[in-house]
Amino acid sequence: MSPQRLAIAAAQYPVDLRSELGAYRDKLARWVGEAASAGAQMLAFPEYGAMEWAGALGVSVAQDLSASLQAVSDAMPEMDAALSELARRHGVHILGPSGPQGRAGGRFVNAARLFAPSGRVGVQDKMIMTPFERDWGIAPGTQLRVFETAIGRIVECLPAHLLREIVLA
């Protein structure tokens, strides 16, 4: 059953040039710890927040879009493990920072991950691309997912014009 009230913490923080992936994991851990201590049950990180990792992967990677997309995509399992552990440790739901995820045919999607206190719940590929995403060659997702959680149904990356369809379903 869903709680009557749901405390949500939305991350708004400066994007930093990190020298290593561990520093970025530490930043996530501090933010999750502070939000959970303040009573947040659901934590949301920024869209494309995972691209902050590109700086920790080296200047040559950070300055090359193709290299950044691939490197951040390759690093996502490490981020997934860290966020899954943080969700378990703090008993919160986390909408992790989205980022590029490699798909068949060498294409990338903008994938958002949702983690429950039990671990990873699922992944939603963004379906409606912005002009810059089209310029980058980011492919749209093809399926809208609804995640059943202890705090209720959650839909990620939802364009406003689809909301009516979801509510009526």
Segments predicted by a language model, with ranges:
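Cys-nucleophile CN-hydrolase/nitrilase-fold catalytic domain and related Cys-dependent amidase chemistry
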Residues: 21-117
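Residue-level recognition of beta-strand->loop/alpha-helix junctions
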Residues: 12-14, 46, 125
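Short, basic, glycine/proline-bearing loop/turn elements
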Residues: 12-19, 64-72, 151-154
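Active-site catalytic loop in hydrolytic enzyme cores
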Residues: 85, 103-169
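Residue-level signal for short, function-critical loop segments
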Residues: 14, 100, 160
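Short beta-strand segments enriched in small/hydrophobic residues
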Residues: 2-16
